[in-house]
Amino acid sequence: VTDDLEARVRRLEDRAQISEQVIRYAMGVDRRDWTMFGDCFTDPVYADFSAGGMPAATVSRDDLVGRISTALNGFTATQHISPNHVIEFDPGDPDRAVCYSYMFAQHLLRGSGNGEYYLLRGSYTNHMLRTPGGWKIERIIQHRSWEYGNKTAVAEAIEQSQAATLS
């Protein structure tokens, strides 16, 4: 019974850590805490945001942080909500799991002539790996269900972010 109880407790701890890492991803983005955001990933990481125009690729963690920060730093504010986590552990490898989660991303771009709001709904498939530093996202795939509002907001925010970097 003790071994079984220990295994069950460890599985619950793993679930909590995986879920927290996915939430920290969203919090890091919204706080513009790129260290927190980057710490969510392995290095390298496979990132597939092709539904939003960023081609799927295996990149360094720093490259992913650079791409995402450039895309989002130009927004006035964002709020990324990641609910409904379903975690499936690899039956052949206790150090691997997949976390499926919903995504609700709100973006505010004050002063845009094309509309200040851009809303995005969808989901993520996060392939997780247990590392010496805890559970990390090894592969992230974004799936978009629908979007509403200023669909040029991301491109506008990138322009603003790049202009701010140059000045």
For each feature predicted by the language model, list its residue ranges.
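Short, low-complexity N-terminal intrinsically disordered segments enriched in polar/charged residues
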Residues: 1-27, 31, 35-43
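A beta-strand edge to alpha-helix "cap/lid" segment located at domain peripheries
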Residues: 2-6, 73-167
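A structural signal for alpha-helical segments
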Residues: 13, 56-59, 116
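Hydrophobic face of alpha-helices
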Residues: 19-22, 65, 121
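A solvent-exposed, acidic/Ser-Thr-rich amphipathic alpha-helical stretch
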Residues: 34-104
